[in-house]
UniProtKB/Swiss-Prot annotation:
Residues 10-24 have a biased composition (Polar residues). Residues 1-24 are annotated as: Disordered. The keyword Phosphoprotein does not apply. Keywords: Transposable element. Belongs to the phage portal family. PBSX subfamily. It holds the Pfam family Phage_portal. This is Protein ORF5 in retron Ec67. The keyword Nucleus does not apply.
Length: 326
């Protein structure tokens, strides 16, 4: 009997020892950049695929990001429109073709013009090739159009028929990269905030608050009537108010918790404003030219000399680069 008590005491001590040593504190969830793994590709520059080089950044991703946020696509449209307005149409290059050429350059950091000739070797037109699907060959003198489809396969452009305008990169010299890459996370954050708020309003299947009842004076019939009233208040965009009469009820027996207080914690306006400022800093276009209204009533509605000079300097730089077409 004494031996069993000793064993029981030893087992109890062992359980206490395990309970004392099993407690463990650790941290997790440290923020990690989602693009840090891509830095490994900088060691190999552009990846060789089949008969051409792939760009260091996904052009398909840049195309989808173009319309992710209004403050990202608007400055690109401003620059494209200004450059197109300064262009003098040429018999070989129409104004619409030049606009496509400029847009590809601003979005992808690369723009291509294909020289098309007749059977006699005479140039009949200069047509922009879609930068999203144009790749540079392994010898760097040839170009490929790599759009796959039901009836299309990659084909090689005639050697010497492609003019390539690129925005220089610091890691490789095969492709160009746009200057707004640092603002892409802000553009995606801006889009996510807008979609989150939009889903909140579309959902709308609530009465706008939580009713918390602890009053014992209520009978089951009153509770059922209140439940039916809450159910009838549901519906898209239905924010109704309810009235309840509770004689001899407690002060805190019925509590109303508005859902708007919970929704206000997502910092929607701050996220939109901060991400907007990041995109504007990357594109360097005055807010007046992007159609942004000033926050204060006394704000300047027109584009001042300083803002216009900054934009004009940027446009002149792009114009000088496009002059290489001639």
């Amino acid at each position: 009997m004494g031996k069993s008590k000793k064993n029981r005491a030893a087992a109890t001590n062992q359980l206490k020892h395990k309970s004392q040593t099993s407690a463990e504190a650790f941290s997790f969830g440290d923020p990690v950049p989602v693009l840090d793994r891509r830095e490994l590709l900088d060691y190999v520059e552009c990846v060789q695929t089949d008969r051409w080089y792939e760009p260091p950044v996904s052009f398909d991703g840049l195309a989808r990001t173009f319309r992710a946020a209004v403050h990202h696509s608007s400055p690109i449209a401003v620059k494209c429109n200004i450059l197109t307005s300064t262009y003098i149409p040429h018999p070989l290059l129409s104004q619409q073709a030049f606009s496509r050429f400029v847009q590809d350059y601003l979005v992808f950091g690369n723009a291509y013009l294909e020289k098309r000739t007749n059977r006699f070797g005479e140039v009949i037109a200069l047509e922009p090739a879609l930068a999203k699907y144009t790749r540079r060959g392994l010898d760097l003198d040839t170009y490929w159009f790599v759009q796959y489809g039901m009836t299309t396969q990659p084909y090689q452009f005639t050697k010497g028929s492609i003019f390539h305008l690129l925005e220089p990169d610091i890691n490789q010299e095969i492709y160009g990269l746009p200057g707004y890459l640092s603002a892409i996370p802000s553009a995606l954050l801006n889009e996510s905030a807008t979609l989150f708020r939009r889903k909140y309003y579309i959902n709308g299947s609530h009465a706008g608050f939580i009713m918390y009842m602890t009053d014992a004076a209520q009978n089951q019939e009153d509770v059922n009537n209140l439940r039916n009233a809450m159910k009838s208040a549901k519906g898209p965009g239905n924010f109704r108010n309810l009235f309840m009469y509770s004689p001899n009820g407690k002060k805190d027996g019925l509590q109303i918790i508005p859902l708007s207080e919970v929704a206000a914690k997502d910092e929607f306006l701050n996220i939109k404003n901060v991400s907007r400022d990041d995109m504007m800093a990357a594109h360097r276009v005055p807010p007046q030219m992007m159609g942004i209204m000033p926050n204060n009533v006394r704000g300047v509605w027109g584009c001042g000399k300083s803002e216009f000079s900054v934009c004009e300097e940027r446009i002149n730089t792009l114009t000088e680069k496009d002059a290489g077409i001639k």
